[in-house]
């Protein structure tokens, strides 16, 4: 008595592998675009966090009459100091362009530039000079 055939033939397996490869090749450009979009979004969120940290520090400095008080008011004289205001610091792979913030400008906001070292993309955030 002949046994009924079980499983897949070699031709069916090759066809399935070829279709899987074609689907993967078609999806690859979409995944690359997704990575670029994720990098840009991460940069924007980090710039927003830096701006929020600067604004909170400025509010603490207003309460302490621009005197440095640990946990409330950090003296900010350069844009690149924003890392001290972020809880975990500035993440690896990002940097803030150094830009002096003169003490006489206290109370006026200015724009600082955050850069992604891997893509070269940049985003700006508002900074507030603080301290005596």
Residue ranges and their predicted role:
Residues 27, 39-42, 46, 78, ...:
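Amphipathic alpha-helical interface surfaces
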Residues 59-132:
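Periplasmic/extracellular, small/polar-rich flexible segments of pilin-like filament-forming proteins
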Residues 1-35:
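N-terminal single-pass transmembrane signal-anchor helix
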Residues 37-64:
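Membrane-proximal N-terminal amphipathic helix
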